[in-house]
Curated annotation (Swiss-Prot):
Keywords: Developmental protein, Disease variant, Disulfide bond, Glycoprotein, Heparin-binding, Secreted, Sensory transduction, Signal, Wnt signaling pathway. Belongs to the R-spondin family. This is R-spondin-2. One of its GO terms (biological process) is bone mineralization. The FU repeat is required for activation and stabilization of beta-catenin. It comes from Homo sapiens. Residues 204-224 have a biased composition (Basic residues). It comes from the Eukaryota. It is linked to Tetraamelia syndrome 2: A form of tetraamelia, a rare disease characterized by rudimentary appendages or complete absence of all four limbs, and other anomalies such as craniofacial, nervous system, pulmonary, skeletal and urogenital defects. TETAMS2 patients manifest limb deformities, bilateral agenesis of the lungs, abnormalities of the pulmonary vasculature, labioscrotal fold aplasia, and dysmorphic features including bilateral cleft lip/palate, ankyloglossia, mandibular hypoplasia, and microretrognathia. TETAMS2 transmission pattern is consistent with autosomal recessive inheritance. Humerofemoral hypoplasia with radiotibial ray deficiency: A severe disease characterized by reduction of all four limbs as well as hypoplasia of the upper limb girdle and pelvis. Rudimentary finger- or toe-like appendages may be present. HHRRD transmission pattern is consistent with autosomal recessive inheritance. The lineage of its organism: Eukaryota, Metazoa, Chordata, Craniata, Vertebrata. Activator of the canonical Wnt signaling pathway by acting as a ligand for LGR4-6 receptors. Upon binding to LGR4-6 (LGR4, LGR5 or LGR6), LGR4-6 associate with phosphorylated LRP6 and frizzled receptors that are activated by extracellular Wnt receptors, triggering the canonical Wnt signaling pathway to increase expression of target genes. Also regulates the canonical Wnt/beta-catenin-dependent pathway and non-canonical Wnt signaling by acting as an inhibitor of ZNRF3, an important regulator of the Wnt signaling pathway. Disulfide bonds join 40-46, 43-52, 55-74, 78-93, 96-104, 101-110, 113-124, 128-141, 145-187, 156-163, 196-203. It is found in: Secreted. Residues 144-204 form the TSP type-1 domain. Residues 204-243 are annotated as: Disordered.
């Protein structure tokens, strides 16, 4: 009788060990299937169809979309256009909300802009704001060359003279207040000139040079010829009308 009871106990123990081993084998095979699937890399829980649903502590959960399909991934760093947002329950990749931003530090602070845009104080611009210049090496807006206000227009002159000519040039200038941070950044023009009419064409008490007299005489002669031709044309027209 005792032998029968002992045999029965051995059978029960063997069955329990077998069930335990089978359960461990199933869990090991399930874990192995996670590891073998590239989608499940770094996951705490994963499925073949939906990918990761929970990530390991230091990784970021990213929901990747491919056409109509979407699946979860666990990444060490977030892809372009996203930033890593850490939270007690699970770290996630959140989308950058800044226009034309390629990578960002937070939802409202960009660290790198898309191609063709310049970074300035966490935002992206196609042209740098006033007072800043584009630095092509880093695609950032840096402090440019700062200049002061324009001066008043100077005296109209020509050949260092303020009389003796009909037309001259007048100039105005401005000063560089702050030099740019890079020598490659050019400053805007600090002097400009424009054509002006002299207030005194003839210098007081001055004598005209022979060249100036000759030029004036030629001009008078040309006007007299033009006037004579005009009068002759009128005379011919009147004569024809009378005939």
């Amino acid at each position: 009788m005792q032998f029968r009871l002992f045999s029965f106990a051995l059978i029960i123990l063997n069955c329990m060990d077998y069930s335990h081993c089978q359960g461990n084998r199933w869990r090991r095979s399930k874990r192995a299937s996670y590891v073998s699937n590239p989608i499940c890399k770094g996951c705490l829980s994963c499925s073949k169809d939906n990918g990761c649903s929970r990530c390991q502590q230091k990784l970021f959960f990213f929901l990747r979309r491919e056409g109509m399909r979407q699946y979860g991934e666990c990444l060490h760093s977030c892809p372009s256009g996203y930033y890593g947002h850490r939270a007690p329950d699970m770290n996630r990749c959140a989308r950058c909300r800044i226009e034309n931003c390629d990578s960002c530090f937070s939802k409202d602070f960009c660290t790198k802009c898309k191609v063709g845009f310049y970074l300035h104080r966490g935002r992206c611009f196609d042209e740098c704001p006033d007072g800043f210049a584009p630095l092509e090496e880093t695609m950032e807006c840096v402090e440019g060359c700062e200049v002061g206000h324009w001066s008043e227009w100077g005296t109209c002159s020509r050949n260092n003279r303020t009389c003796g000519f009909k037309w001259g040039l007048e100039t105005r200038t401005r000063q560089i207040v702050k030099k740019p941070v890079k020598d490659t950044i050019l400053c805007p023009t600090i002097a400009e000139s424009r054509r002006c009419k002299m207030t005194m064409r003839h210098c007081p008490g001055g004598k005209r040079t022979p060249k100036a007299k000759e030029k004036r005489n030629k001009k008078k002669k040309r006007k007299l010829i033009e006037r004579a031709q005009e009068q002759h044309s009128v005379f011919l027209a009147t004569d024809r009308a009378n005939q």
